[in-house]
Amino acid sequence: MTIGCMSAIGSNGSLLTAPDMRRRLRELQERGGKLVVIDPRRSETAHIADEHVAVVPGADAALLLAMVQVIVKAGLAQERWLEQHTRGFQEVAAAISDFTPERVAAVAGVPAEVIVRLAHEFASARSSVAYARIGICNNAYSTVASYAVDLLNAVAGRLGAAGGAVFPKPAIDLPRLSRLSGADGFARWKSRVRGLPETAGDVPASTLAEEMETVGTGQVRALVTFAGNPVLTVPNGQRLARALQKLDFMVSIDMYINETTRF
């Protein structure tokens, strides 16, 4: 089963993602599939897409939840699949009931009729997938937006399905390693400043700047980064950039000078 409809959110896949992605996207279109790019910017991928939806920056979550709301209201949700593989679907459906296309249109800058059409096309296609990259991870609602991508795939029954969002076997089975090492828990300890709970041994990266700035026992005074750019990828990157300059010691292992390694 090949993809019939692919919605790429905050992704410039033809240029920056998997090897030879531009060819793969072209083949998707040649098979009769539709490529929809949801991105404020007319990127290289948006330029070759069948449809470019220029959402207002930061409104990705609202747009995606509105699409889910349309699918649920229209009776297109794969409820049998959801009953077998998920918990809490009815609670989620109730929670997003106010995200109507009419209300979201003003926020997202996308006409209500377009939101409705996109939702119907996604849920009704023989196969479809919503795919997102770092573009949706750089705004105030990035966590909700990332969740909404999975939610959209789930209500349409596309998680783990042929032509949908598949789960390939990774080279390194990190979930299994987490279980074996005992690092797969939740809230066993909390961050020093705000008391945010850990998940699988980590706290949100958004705590990094405050842990550097706040004086006291356990204050972060040194940092090692490896092939990463937290100033760009962590929320409120400018605050983190200011905090990095006040560290006692910092090492960055990377091939490039970027927003983080320059410190």
Language-model segment annotations:
Residues 49, 178-180:
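Short aromatic-enriched loop/helix-cap "lid" or pocket-rim segments at secondary-structure transitions
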Residues 173-176:
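Flexible, small-/acidic-enriched active-site or ligand-binding loops
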